[in-house]
Amino acid sequence: MSEAEARPTNFIRQIIDEDLATGKHTTVHTRFPPEPNGYLHIGHAKSICLNFGIAQDYQGQCNLRFDDTNPVKEDIEYVESIKNDVQWLGFHWSGDVCYSSDYFDQLHQYAVELINKGLAYVDELSPDEIREYRGTLKAPGKNSPYRDRSVEENLALFEKMRSGGFEEGKACLRAKIDMASPFIVMRDPVLYRIKFAEHHQTGNKWCIYPMYDFTHCISDALEGITHSLCTLEFQDNRRLYDWVLDNISIPVHPRQYEFSRLNLEYTVMSKRKLNQLVTEKHVEGWDDPRMPTISGLRRRGYTAESIREFCKRIGVTKQDNTIEMASLESCIREDLNENAPRAMAVIDPVKLVIENYPQGESEMVAMPNHPNKPEMGSREVPFSAEIWIDRADFREEANKQYKRLVLGKEVRLRNAYVIKAERVEKDAEGNITTIFCTYDADTLSKDPADGRKVKGVIHWVSAAHALPVEIRLYDRLFSVPNPGAEEDFLAVINPDSLVIKQGYAEPSLAQAEAGKAYQFEREGYFCLDSRYANASSLVFNRTVGLRDTWAKVGE
């Protein structure tokens, strides 16, 4: 990550500054602890930038730790994708990758310690009964009939759980805290449950697996984490985090701090809902360019720099809010406007024939790769008598506000000649199939000699040299700003979230690299789809338009 990216300020950094100033800590050690049960999304990017960014700015350490305590939902595929996403965003973890499963032996020992202290018991209520006994926000819970078992009985039963003597759902280990607590998380939470499933790291060694709240705090302590940063939904869980560490013989007690999660308009962040979109094939996969996943954004053409800039702009607070899509798009638009080379592509093509241009001949026209960056060089683009232009760039009749090609009037072809539309040819349905023009041979990249003004400029591609391309125009995945609030979020999927066009591009794009962004002049920013980089027909994804369209969406 570039050192030029300014160091942000927020309440968490203020806490760290104070901890260092008072000597509470002499170094900073954070962690990013995803569960490997899905692909990371833009919300995780905020946490990645926060945790790794803090470690980097304070010359500390940040661990990448996989919270792999549920083998049923986890997979090595997700482990690898998460590692790739973190590195792609420009960050590097300290030391080896950590896994909560690395600590399964120690976690088991601490569970036994709680049993010996009379602070944990084996419960044989069913999962439904446990929920019923837990009570509600308005009604206290009630004690399990198994709550007062002796230490010796609990130790024996816990060992029976570990050795496979119970079926799944028939027993669990619970903390013994307070069933009347105003905080439901403290009403004898489950610490261990039974799952007969092979684990991607430990195989079949275990059939009991610790719960997140028990694992998380102990893993932090074992790794020497100084500042454990979580999103606000874990605010009440901090009480359990502290209770566990206060009641086991572990010398280190990290502190948990909460910040607001990232909510983005016109999408969903729930892993369950994202998984449903994938498994029911509403999208192409986890890396579908309409998905809010980091892999989806990357495939769409977002850069790591733009995502880091977005996370910096939205900041870190305790106030939950929903970020407008325009905020994310402005970051990538600014990045690509500055750095993307230009190219020409026609998305909705119509043939244009220049009747007085030498037929069968062609010439090379010089074009800058960036209008404001001569250091990016130039390229040669072929020009001939037959070209493709965009259908929207021609009208038979138009008012003065229309600055493109009109029958009987002139327009300039980008970096080429001034042409005049003379007549059109139509099919049986009245659709224009060919526009016939003449050109001024003395206007190659210069104004007409007689001083007449030609205001409009349109882009083009030589028909004889054109590269056939598939162009995918992506829009928001949902038609309402907050689809997650809908009774059926699938009912508000935007039917026009993907429009596929068959167009033509200048031949230089045959050498385009997968994922590299280009500004298709007058159209928007596009990148070669990495999934189809080796296909016979190249596929370009629209990353973002040239202008903010979200203001209009909201009107």
UniProtKB/Swiss-Prot annotation:
GO terms for biological process: glutaminyl-tRNA aminoacylation; glutamyl-tRNA aminoacylation. It is found in: Cytoplasm. One of its GO terms (molecular function) is ATP binding. It is an enzyme of class 6 (ligase). Its main location: cytoplasm. Keywords: Aminoacyl-tRNA synthetase, ATP-binding, Cytoplasm, Ligase, Nucleotide-binding, Protein biosynthesis. Disulfide bonds: none annotated. It comes from the Bacteria. Residues 317-324 are annotated as: Interaction with tRNA. A motif ('KMSKS' region) lies at residues 268-272. ATP binds at residues 35-37, 41-47, 231, 261-262, 269-271. It catalyses: tRNA(Gln) + L-glutamine + ATP = L-glutaminyl-tRNA(Gln) + AMP + diphosphate. L-glutamine binds at D67, Y212. One of its GO terms (cellular component) is cytosol. A motif ('HIGH' region) lies at residues 34-44. Its EC number is 6.1.1.18. InterPro entries: aa-tRNA-synth_I_CS, Gln-tRNA-synth, Gln/Glu-tRNA_Ligase, Gln_tRNA_ligase_bac, Glu/Gln-tRNA-synth, Glu/Gln-tRNA-synth_Ib_cat-dom, Glu/Gln-tRNA-synth_Ib_codon-bd, Glu_tRNA_lig_a-bdl. Belongs to the class-I aminoacyl-tRNA synthetase family. Monomer. This is Glutamine--tRNA ligase. It comes from Klebsiella pneumoniae (strain 342).
